[in-house]
Amino acid sequence: MIERYSHMRWVSGYLERRAGDVPNTYVAEYQLSDLMRKGLIERNAGQDFLNSAGLLDFHWSITWPEDFDVPDEMLVNRIGDVAGYVVFVHGWTGNMHIWEELPGMVVNKQRQLVAISIDHNGFGKSLFEDKTPPLQSCNPPAAMRTLQNFIELIKIRRQRGETRTKVINFVGHSMGGATLFYMNPMLWNYGEVTRMALAPALLLEDESHRVFYTTLGLGIGILQRLPVLELVERFIKPSVFRTLTAGASDRVKDLHAAQYSDTPKGITGAALMAMGVLNDYEIARDFTLMRVMLGHRDPLVGLVNMMDLLGDLEFPAKNIHVVPGTHYMFSIGSETPANAYLHAQAREMVVEDIVNLHEEAMRMQKVGPRIG
């Protein structure tokens, strides 16, 4: 069979392939070092990517809709011949699994999309080389540069000679949502990229939460150097994770607790401090294809301060959704039936927003920019 998307040969080199959590979807997982070893990603390019981000490795998965199990020899063309990709970017102490059914729901809603869920910024299986990385290596602007480089590495943008229009749709939560504000529109073509920020922890105008993240990050970082304080951590950890994952499913709560335990304390502490001390206002005022969703009971992202910041950034009011819910407004927990009902509705809104953004971007590419 002729591979029309030979630049995406890495798709065939999955570590594992399985049925997805959502019916009629499939998932394949990838590790950059494994793809380099197999010759499916050029070794020098892969190593340059890791070196620029200070990472030991990079881990991701893809989710696609299918009514049957596509044979391996057809997989590259199947994943390449689409209208776009949805890149899911988790928050602190998260990993690519915190999204649960959301990637599958999106690709089932718009079957010309493929979802890519990543581990990033030192979490999951994308660990930093340095167990206590410098803050400028793990703050939102640095994470956005890594995302941009990753997209270029796996070549999912429209390549020279391709006839189809493609859109890259970013979806970020918490730290991942803040990351999306630092996208450089100069690196993208007209209508090529969209952004959906869920509970973005962008704290430029929120002094109380800045202090919270900075202090928490400093405290966790100290545990890396003074293990004797782990007794204190046993009392702090349950409270912190109750706050972070309030309203989320038990699975998400367990994932965060396990990820916290598995991640070097220096990495977790640095990621938190980087959000707390961030003072970078170099944010392009280009929000036509960006949406923000905020939860009214989010203890980690202050609603009033975030709305003030969005106003200062001249973010369009019509592109903001405030929904009844917590920091994890898209995860359906079992704490109360009312909370589960509200989060279920918010999750449906997230799916609709992602698909609508994608379709608007496609329309913009086909029509072209208006001049004059």
Language-model segments: residues:
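Conserved acidic catalytic loop of the alpha/beta-hydrolase fold
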Residues: 142-166
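Conserved serine/cysteine hydrolase catalytic core
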Residues: 269-308
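Active-site glycine-rich loops that stabilize anionic/oxyanionic intermediates
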Residues: 91-94
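Conserved alpha/beta-hydrolase
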Residues: 110-129
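Conserved alpha/beta-hydrolase catalytic His-Asp/Glu region
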Residues: 206-207, 226-285
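Alpha/beta-hydrolase fold catalytic core
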Residues: 1-86, 111-114, 336, 351-352, ...
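Catalytic histidine-centered segment of alpha/beta-hydrolase-like enzymes
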Residues: 325-345
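Flexible "cap/lid" loop of the alpha/beta hydrolase fold
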Residues: 185, 194-224
